[in-house]
Amino acid sequence: MRKYNDKHIPVLPNEVVEYLLWKDNGIYVDCTAGEGGHTFLIAKKCPNSRVIAIDVDLEVLEIAQKNLKAFHNVILLKASYVDLPVVLKSLGIERVSGILADLGISTYQLKAEGRGFSFNRDEPLDMRMDIQQDTSAHKITNFYSEEKLSKIIFKYGEERFARRIAKQIVKNRPINTTKELVEIIKKALPPSEIRKRKRHFATKTFQAIRIEVNKELKNIEQLLKNAEELLEIGGRLAIISFHSLEDRIVKHFIKNSNNLKHIAGPIKPTQEETKNNPRARSAKLRVAERI
């Protein structure tokens, strides 16, 4: 296990419990098990329900297994929510009572040494949520064309200096570490732009590359389609997003669906929660019911 000392705190815990868990003798799916924070709450609140918890990250599932060992109603599996129909079929399950997804990067992935998600440490460029997949941040930064890099950084990072950054990336290849990438981004941006940004100047580019590595937005669309098919009548879908690109997809899908009814959201964390868990500050929860 990698060096990792942070304690994970699930985002919007009370709200997830309130809106997702509408019956105790159901089947609930946590599509992003992570360290097991939300899964723990679901299993504890609904002891007569089956809880299927999946994640693509084998390392984080090891932590979840320890955190959830007291529960006999939880099944932990290494799988992507893109493949949820196959996962449930293998368990003999046709319909479920609730589906939860806490999107984006996990605390473990950001803080554990050597995963390459953070611009605050010097690590090999990686950013894979599933460490068994081939495509990594190193592959994208070193082998994508300047045009393709520019499109990704603009589209997924909403970075208006995408062309300048892409040009510098190609010019400074090979790029092997997060620190090298940060310095290249810094070189590409006007000094005045760096000074006026509230967040770290590399945030947008790192987000864009991470989304491309893990096909995050494409996968969210598939998750929503899966949920629409797999939820029983009255079943709940709860999605926590952390940036506008994710939230927009969820919002529009629910709005345009003939089978889902919007029942809550966007629900944002209270001031007290963001004080205790700064990661929660940009979280938005949207909830829909299968009709």
From Swiss-Prot:
Chief site of localization: cytoplasm
A GO CC annotation given for this chain: cytoplasm
EC class of the enzyme, as a word: transferase
Gene3D superfamilies per the UniProt record, alphabetical: Putative methyltransferase TM0872, insert domain, Vaccinia Virus protein VP39
Localization: Cytoplasm
Pfam families: Methyltransf_5
Keywords: Cytoplasm, Methyltransferase, rRNA processing, S-adenosyl-L-methionine, Transferase
Protein EC: 2.1.1.199
GO biological process, one term: rRNA base methylation
GO molecular function: rRNA (cytosine-N4-)-methyltransferase activity
Catalysed reactions, as listed in the record: cytidine(1402) in 16S rRNA + S-adenosyl-L-methionine = N(4)-methylcytidine(1402) in 16S rRNA + S-adenosyl-L-homocysteine + H(+)
Disordered: annotated span: 268-291
PANTHER family (alphabetical): 12S RRNA N4-METHYLCYTIDINE METHYLTRANSFERASE, S-ADENOSYL-METHYLTRANSFERASE MRAW
Protein family membership: Belongs to the methyltransferase superfamily. RsmH family.
HAMAP family on file: 16SrRNA_methyltr_H (MF_01007)
Function summary: Specifically methylates the N4 position of cytidine in position 1402 (C1402) of 16S rRNA.
NCBIfam families referenced in this protein's UniProt entry, alphabetically: 16S rRNA (cytosine(1402)-N(4))-methyltransferase RsmH
Protein name: Ribosomal RNA small subunit methyltransferase H
Originating gene: rsmH
